[in-house]
């Protein structure tokens, strides 16, 4: 399998993405390091899909990870320091998730595995800065970026919330999720009946004291690989808007009192049958190989 991977898109929360560098070094695959903070899974997925769509690769690996203790040491305080965390703070997830993207044409020849879903669209996010400076309230810093990307996505794709079974953000958690709903309502967009946040799903918050919820690159990656994709494969959800969110801070900018810009990248993931029905209607004249240029298997 590693020989068939043309590119690896990988990133994490540590400086110079060293977790990714050491973690995938033995794969001996061409690697493109990426950093989008906690939005990195959305960044790797969207970039990987565009590479495959453009014909630059038949198979790419998209992977990210995060680790609680290392993130605390780099961005806040070492765990053994015993710093008290406010209720707005999020708990960095120790976890990793990876997916392989392949073109339809490549799948018809290799038959590596049964594909779970298809990526049918991406919306690359813009940096949005509302002047938030509290590193213990990253949900508030990321919510405006999530709002901006979701609104832009609806405009670009001429869609509305009801076109998706779920709209899933990365790690806004309790505070950021409420802010997102309010910000979208100001724009006359209501996603409250179908919104889900990975940071609120990853932990059992009634049993685990994680304050506002989960965060980190691994948060959305783990939920995507272990929960979202199986739900789509079972046709429980047929169309999902996956929007990982990231707070673009560093320990230097934080210590200097700079604000925390946010970013979010949206990826449309669809069940195979629901996509194929619409795809066939619009592309009857195209062959399967040509059709592979406009859709990506996961």
Question: What residue spans do the PLM features occupy?
Answer:
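Short acidic, glycine/serine/threonine-rich loops at helix termini
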Residues: 19-21, 71-76, 132, 178-180, ...
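Condensing-enzyme catalytic core mediating Claisen C-C bond formation in acyl metabolism
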Residues: 78-151, 156-159, 189, 193-210, ...
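Active-site-proximal alpha-helical scaffold in enzymes
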Residues: 35-62, 101, 215-236
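Internal helical hairpin/lid segments
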Residues: 167-192, 196-228
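Phosphate/pyrophosphate-binding loops at sites that engage ATP/ADP/AMP, CoA/4′-phosphopantetheine
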Residues: 1-6, 149-163, 231-232
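Conserved beta-ketoacyl condensing-enzyme motif
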Residues: 1-38, 163-178
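Flexible, glycine-rich active-site loops centered on histidine and acidic residues
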Residues: 58-92
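Short beta-strand segments
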Residues: 9-11, 60-66, 101, 240-245
